[in-house]
């Protein structure tokens, strides 16, 4: 949203107008990163937003509305406002995906009764990445999937009712889907090939000219700003296919990124298409949809970073959702047609099939509710190990991402040593090997617990009486939450109980007798009064906050 604000204030894509530090350049394979800020690209003396510009441009009207209410991604001193950024993103993303849910409903009503149409909306909007990813923040897919969903709706309306396809509108929607997320080039190709079968020569020419016009404008934008035909993010050189088969299987069946695990309703849709293929209409459209789905799975498996970094589930496959919704509608229509052909005679399969579908739908909604609501699923990406540094975690069935916060992570194979008089700074990444579960990401002064239980693990080379000095403070809300009671256990044995009512960071010593210490130790904090700021009406934070810890240090006795 900062780029949107820059376009409003300065009519420029250069972010130099704002108080953004020019950090030492980090040479990435495809661009020059501004220090450790992957979102920013250095081009000569200028700073640009590395991610696609389409979302920022389309969001300008909404940023103007936010500005009218005093909300901005830029503070009065021209520095970045994380509060303004997240506030605008969360509201806009939720609104856009609500519009997409309406599009899904009207798509379904073209072919299905009201009840089935509502089930399609629940599955498409709540049982997919639309809820857990695209509605939570302004990802590149958020605008793109809405634009593409409208295109699919227009195509289905033509197939069912013969509704006129507006050539320039379709061309423009597809162009802007590409400007917001270049992976949608796959879907543009699929739709373009499909249109060859239904358009007249004159319509094809108009469609091609619309695409050429938008493409020319984009090349001019890129050349003016970067002296390149395409911006860095859009170049195909980012695809390497070095771990293709691992990536493809991971994108399909891994417990923390697999499409078939997070959206098992896809399996139900595939069954419908096969089982009722004789009653299936619009088979040409089905073929294009399946080809586009397969192509995107191949492309996203070509990235070295195929798991999508610190994200939830199959984020990189979000663009498949409109196709899957379309196939679901066609499959359900074929199922209903089959029933009519049999005279609506009830059989055991008649009842078993809807039950199986509803069961898979309920599981899909549960999985994506976890990603949308539980902060523990976000913390999973960094604790107990950073998934970008240990991507093997994606395959660990002992704690799938969607069960983070419900299941503790497996006990680490390696427990870091904690030398005496060595302070663990909880604001740094160096502290993370000591944190097992129940912790949030680091903040400037401390790190919050995010559940009623949180643990620290450490190993000792010498066992003797120790005192652990913990610098911490409780989460308090005047008049609503006046103290936090903290019970501390070492290796399952109670050490102390504290009543914390001082809101300032304070050092609390905890005695650790030699007879309770082991070579490998687990220190557990139980905070029964942990609560979310949102539940107490003091903010939008849904994390279950108990205490915040700044540091911990072992002192020999």
Language-model-detected regions and their locations in the chain:
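Interfacial juxtamembrane loops and adjacent helix segments
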Residues: 9-91, 238-239, 304
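Membrane-lumen/periplasm interface segments of multi-pass, membrane-embedded glycan/lipid transferases
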Residues: 21-50, 219, 223-278, 391-418, ...
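Transmembrane-helix signature of polytopic, membrane-embedded enzymes
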Residues: 71-80, 99-127, 146, 160-169
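Transmembrane alpha-helix segments characteristic
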Residues: 119-124, 151, 169-174, 212, ...
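Membrane-interface transmembrane helices that cradle and orient dolichyl/undecaprenyl
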Residues: 151-167, 177
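Perimembrane helix-loop-helix junctions
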Residues: 186-212, 268-281, 342
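Signature aromatic-anchored transmembrane alpha helix within multi-pass, membrane-resident enzymes
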Residues: 209-216, 282-294, 335-374
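C-terminal luminal/periplasmic domains and tails of membrane-associated envelope-modifying transferases
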Residues: 387-557
């Amino acid at each position: 949203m900062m780029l949107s604000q820059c376009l409003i204030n300065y009519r420029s894509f250069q972010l130099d107008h704002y108080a953004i530090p020019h950090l030492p350049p980090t040479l990435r394979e495809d661009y020059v990163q501004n220090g450790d800020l992957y979102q920013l690209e250095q081009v000569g003396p200028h700073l640009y937003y590395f991610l696609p510009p389409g979302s920022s441009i389309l969001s300008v009207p909404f940023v103007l509305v936010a500005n009218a209410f005093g909300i901005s991604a830029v503070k009065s001193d021209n520095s970045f406002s994380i509060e303004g950024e997240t506030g605008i993103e969360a509201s806009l993303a939720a609104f856009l995906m609500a519009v997409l849910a309406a599009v899904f409903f009207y798509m379904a009503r073209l072919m299905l009764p009201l009840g089935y149409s509502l089930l399609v909306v629940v599955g498409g909007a709540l049982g997919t990445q639309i809820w857990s990813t695209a509605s939570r923040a302004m990802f590149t897919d958020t605008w793109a999937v809405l634009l593409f969903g409208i295109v699919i709706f227009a195509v289905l309306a033509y197939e069912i009712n013969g509704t006129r396809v507006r050539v320039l509108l379709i061309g423009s929607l597809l162009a802007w889907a590409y400007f917001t997320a270049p992976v949608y080039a796959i879907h543009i190709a699929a739709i373009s090939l499909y249109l060859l079968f239904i358009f007249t020569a004159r319509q094809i020419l108009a469609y091609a000219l619309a695409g050429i016009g938008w493409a020319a404008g984009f090349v001019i934008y890129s050349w003016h700003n970067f002296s390149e035909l395409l911006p860095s993010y859009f170049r195909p050189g980012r695809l390497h296919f070095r771990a293709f088969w691992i990536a493809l299987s991971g994108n399909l069946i891994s417990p923390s990124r697999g499409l078939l695990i997070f959206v098992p309703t896809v399996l139900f849709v595939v069954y419908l298409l096969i089982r009722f293929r004789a009653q299936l209409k619009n088979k040409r459209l089905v073929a294009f949809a399946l080809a586009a789905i397969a192509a995107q799975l191949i492309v996203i498996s070509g990235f070295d970073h195929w798991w999508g970094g610190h994200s939830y589930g199959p984020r990189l496959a979000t663009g498949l959702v409109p196709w899957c919704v379309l196939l679901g509608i066609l499959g359900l229509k074929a199922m209903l047609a089959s029933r009519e052909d049999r005279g609506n005679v009830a059989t055991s399969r008649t009842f078993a099939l809807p039950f199986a579908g509803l069961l898979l739908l309920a599981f899909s909604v549960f999985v994506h509710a976890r990603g949308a609501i539980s902060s523990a699923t976000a913390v999973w990406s960094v604790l107990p190990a950073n998934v970008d540094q240990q991507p093997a975690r994606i395959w660990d069935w002992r704690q799938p991402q969607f069960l983070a916060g419900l299941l503790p992570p497996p006990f680490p194979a390696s427990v870091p040593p904690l030398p005496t008089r060595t302070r663990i700074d909880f604001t740094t990444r160096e502290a993370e090997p000591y944190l097992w579960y129940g912790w949030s990401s680091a903040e400037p002064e401390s790190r919050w617990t995010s559940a009623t239980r949180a643990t620290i693990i450490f190993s000792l080379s010498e066992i003797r009486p120790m005192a652990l000095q913990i610098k911490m403070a409780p989460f308090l809300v005047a008049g609503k939450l006046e103290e936090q009671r903290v019970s501390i256990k070492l290796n399952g044995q109670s050490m102390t109980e504290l009543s914390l009512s001082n809101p300032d960071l304070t050092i609390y010593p905890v005695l650790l007798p030699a007879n309770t210490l082991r070579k490998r130790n687990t220190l557990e904090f139980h905070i029964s009064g942990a609560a979310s700021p949102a539940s107490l009406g003091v903010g939008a934070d849904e994390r279950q906050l108990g205490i915040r810890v700044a540091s911990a240090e072992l002192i020999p006795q």
